[in-house]
Regions:
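Donor-sugar nucleotide-binding helix/loop cap in glycosyltransferases
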Residues: 1-216
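Long, low-complexity, charge-rich intrinsically disordered regions
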Residues: 189-192, 210-213, 219-294
Length: 294
């Protein structure tokens, strides 16, 4: 297993898309310093994705590469699903997702419990041939492409998040948990709702956001959203998703800091979701909508 971090992989993918010729270690070192051994590991992973080939100590695009670049620019969650399809050609990552889908979640012991973490690593090695370090890397890969949900509100486990429920099943789950969180003045915290719904339906947070936005647009009178300065005080749940290539590069150009491009968007679940361009943290769901409200 070659646990390569996403920023490094996407630096190389960007170089492959930008250069007319092969990408070498010297090319990559302009943006991010890596060793020759790490460059070889990157090559093995990208060959696994079926988007690049190793040739004379360099990397060249495969016949599938242009399709990957097109995936990279697709809007919404469809972009993540498309990229994940390439990721899954890489056997160790696919083994991780298959195991997670079967188990539904992986219980991760706290850092101070070294014995329990060692035992988990031994179990993972035996069952799926992966080290603890590999799983710790792949959980971020999976989150970035809407296949993993990392809970920091309900628990701290790695949850399968690759399910694709229809809008009806999503709404039923949302309504059930809305009734259970006992909202103040009718307004429930969206992060708390998301944690419950994501764990029940086995969906990633970004898919929750997409389906929630869809409901808000379909039934704007029923789903009343609000902004709030309040954040859940006891949790800090990171969310990251792969940005479209053009958007990531535009953000980097606007900042002009001379730093590597940030290929993923990073935020906190507690900061709510976007409905259109509006960031909302609270929702009130009207169980009955009168003709006047419609």
């Amino acid at each position: 297993m070659d646990p390569v971090l996403l920023p490094t992989l996407f630096d190389v993918l960007d170089l492959l898309a930008s250069k007319a010729g092969p990408v070498t270690l010297d090319d990559l070192n302009v943006a991010r310093r890596v060793t020759s051994r790490r460059f070889a590991e990157i090559g093995r992973v990208l060959e696994g994705f079926q988007v690049a080939e190793r040739k004379d100590f360099s990397l060249v695009p495969s016949v599938n590469f242009q399709q990957f670049v097109e995936c990279w620019e697709v809007a919404g969650v469809a972009r993540l699903d498309c990229i994940n399809a390439f990721f899954r050609h890489y056997r160790p990552y696919d083994n991780f997702l298959c195991f997670l889908e079967t188990q539904k979640h992986i219980e991760v012991p706290p850092r101070q419990d070294s014995e329990a973490r060692h035992n988990l690593g031994a179990e993972l090695k035996e069952k799926v041939g992966l080290t603890f370090v590999a799983v710790d890397t792949f959980k971020w890969w999976g989150m970035a492409v809407a296949q993993v949900y990392l809970s920091h509100i309900g628990d701290r486990n790695i949850h399968w998040g690759g399910a694709r429920p229809d809008i009806g099943a999503f709404e039923n789950s949302l309504l059930r948990h809305y009734a259970q969180v006992k909202p103040l003045d009718g307004f429930a915290n969206i992060a708390q709702l998301a944690d419950r719904v994501c764990r029940e339906l086995n969906i990633a947070f970004v898919r929750f956001e997409s389906l929630f936005e869809q409901l808000c647009f379909q039934e704007p009178r029923r789903y009343v959203t609000a902004t709030s300065l309040a954040r859940l005080p006891t949790s800090k749940s990171p969310v990251q998703t792969i940005l479209p290539r053009s958007k990531a590069k535009q953000i980097a150009d606007n900042l002009r800091l001379g730093k590597p491009v940030e290929w993923t968007e990073k935020r906190l679940m507690e900061d709510g979701v976007f409905v259109g361009r509006r960031n909302v943290k609270m929702v009130r769901i009207l169980l009955e909508v009168t003709n006047e409200q419609q």
